[in-house]
Every structure is written in C-alpha cells, then in structure tokens.
Design a protein with these regions (language model features):
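Extended boundary segments
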Residues: 1-47, 120
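Short, basic/aromatic beta-hairpin or loop at an interaction surface
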Residues: 43-58
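Short alpha-helix capping/helix-loop boundary micro-motifs
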Residues: 60-67
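Short, compositionally biased
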Residues: 84-107
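Glycine- and charge-enriched low-complexity intrinsically disordered segments
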Residues: 102-130
Length: 130
C-alpha cells in the first residue's frame, strides 16, 4: 500500500535538489527507524532556518556524513513534525506542501496548522473535503 499524505491522497515527492527524506528518496516517507518523524514537506525560509539553528537544529550547514548538503531559502525538505510545530508556535513556520507531507505528521501537528501554511492549496479548497 502506498504511503498517504495529510489530505488522504498518495504521498507525492517533496524534493530532489537536494534529495530529501529520511530515506533520501525524495519523499517524506517514515518508518520505525525515523525516530524524529521527518514527515513535513517544508519550503525553507530564512526565518525558519534561523529558528531551527536557534533551537540546535542547524539545517544550513552541510554534513557530508549524512548526505546533507545544507539548506538555503527555497529548498524543499522533510523536517521533523515536532520541530515544524515548534516553529509554528513561535510564529516562524515554514510553508508546507500538503500533498508531500506524510499522514503520520498528523500524529504531532494538527491539520489546521499545516493548512494555515499550505502552499499547494487548490483554487477551490472545498474540493479537498470530498
């Protein structure tokens, strides 16, 4: 069975430049090894990156040992649900691609919070509630 996104559809890729995902497969897939739940497909902003650095999660600096290139504003990256939620509470949440955000993110983050920051909302949002 295919992984599902927070809207109930098939999980879409998040990013391939740089290649994201806990499994470095371009998707915000998760599994038992992913203890941090890297399930939110976020579009990096300077504010979000600065916030993450401030809480001890430096996403800007490369870490070659983990195939991590370091991120810049505009990059799409699978971030942990807890860190995204913390940024949301602190007023600096990164925009979210709902179709690429794994349904397991909902174990931590309310759907309404994700929708508030969605960048892939269709012209008719009512169509999401079929």
């Amino acid at each position: 069975m295919a992984d599902r996104n927070v809207l109930g559809g098939e999980l879409e890729p998040c990013g391939d430049d740089p290649v994201t995902g806990f499994y470095r497969d371009g998707c915000c897939n998760t599994g038992p090894e992913d203890l941090g739940s890297h399930t939110v497909c976020a579009v990096m902003t300077a504010e979000f990156l600065g916030h993450q650095r401030g809480i001890g999660n430096d996403l800007s600096s490369p870490v070659p040992a983990y195939q991590f290139p370091g991120l810049v504003p505009g990059d799409r990256w699978c971030v942990t649900a807890a860190n995204w939620l913390r940024a949301h509470h602190d007023g600096v949440a990164a925009p979210v691609v709902l179709a690429s955000t794994h349904e397991r993110a909902l174990d931590v983050v309310p759907l309404a919070a994700l929708q508030e920051h969605a960048v892939d909302v269709p012209a008719n949002p009512g169509a999401l509630e079929d």
